[in-house]
């Protein structure tokens, strides 16, 4: 499938908030809390990108916010619809392009990923993120991997790879 990546609009964010699984518990305990947390996350982000399919429907959001104790490091986040489970190479290629843009603003991207999110960890590793051994995250008490990517360490995409996924 082909996609268009642009800066996210409020309509993209609203659509993705409604598409979130309220039973996942990742962004809160109910639909309202999910939407509120996504909106707060977007508001604190310096970049929010959306991928839209051929019909113009948002299918992924990526964002980055400055780390509170070091504004040169970006705390990266992403949210994707289920269709990318059948198209992991497309999602990996799109993510690589978006993360390269983010690294134009930040010297490093990082976050903590729950060890149970194996596909997310493998996606980030395949793009070039370093995945640290699992450790208990002090803020959440959850076993997480610290993942990070420094500027200059991104997997470059050839024009052929880009044209396969971009409109």
Locate predicted features.
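A short beta-loop-alpha structural element at the N-terminal edge
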Residues: 1-18
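Active-site rim helix/loop that mediates acceptor-substrate recognition in acyltransferases
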Residues: 28-47
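Charged interaction scaffolds used for protein-protein
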Residues: 45, 52-53, 153-156, 165-167
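Conserved beta-hairpin
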Residues: 45-64
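Conserved acetyl-CoA binding element of GNAT-fold acetyltransferases
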Residues: 71-85
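Conserved acetyl-CoA-binding loop-helix of GNAT-fold acetyltransferases
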Residues: 87-101, 122, 126
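Conserved beta-strand-loop-alpha-helix junction that forms the acyl-donor binding cleft
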Residues: 109-125, 137-139
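Conserved catalytic-core motifs of GNAT/GCN5-like acyltransferases
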Residues: 112, 130-145
């Amino acid at each position: 499938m082909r996609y268009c990546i642009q800066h996210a609009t409020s309509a993209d964010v609203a659509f993705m908030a409604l598409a979130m699984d309220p039973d996942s518990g990742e962004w809160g305990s109910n639909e309202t809390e999910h939407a509120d947390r996504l909106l707060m996350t977007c508001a604190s982000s310096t970049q929010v990108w959306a991928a839209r399919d051929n019909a113009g429907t948002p299918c992924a959001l990526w964002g980055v916010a400055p780390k509170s104790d070091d504004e040169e490091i970006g705390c990266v986040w992403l949210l994707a619809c289920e269709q990318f489970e059948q198209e992991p190479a497309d999602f990996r290629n799109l993510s690589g392009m978006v993360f390269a843009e983010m690294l134009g603003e930040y010297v490093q991207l990082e976050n903590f990923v729950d060890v149970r999110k194996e596909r997310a960890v493998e996606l980030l590793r395949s793009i070039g993120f370093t995945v640290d051994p699992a450790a208990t995250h002090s803020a959440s008490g959850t076993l997480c991997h610290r993942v990070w990517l420094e500027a200059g360490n991104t997997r470059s995409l050839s024009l052929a790879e880009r044209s396969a996924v971009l409109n």
